[in-house]
Amino acid sequence: MSTNVQDISVIIPLYNEEESLPELVSWIEKVMQQHHYSYEIIMIDDGSKDDSWKVIASLAEKNPQVRGFKFKRNYGKSAALHKGFEAANGKVVITMDADLQDSPDEIP
């Protein structure tokens, strides 16, 4: 577990969201860089049946701010959020849905 304190932790519980993840991470990165925030993006794959975990692993490999956790089965949003809060190192913690319904532009 990283002990580096970030300005913001963004926790994203998800289930079968492989298509939206690259766009979401890119959008969050853009907002954080515009406002000069240090940040981490914590994605919790809640037992997805699609390739969400492969996408998370690929994003984490390219970006040290991205971390992922994978549940073997679907435990529900509350359990995924709980895991995210346990892992978060941010002074401020924000939760977002992975389906692009929440705009990262609202973070600041």
Feature map (PLM): residue ranges:
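Structured catalytic core of nucleotide-sugar glycosyltransferases
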Residues: 1-108
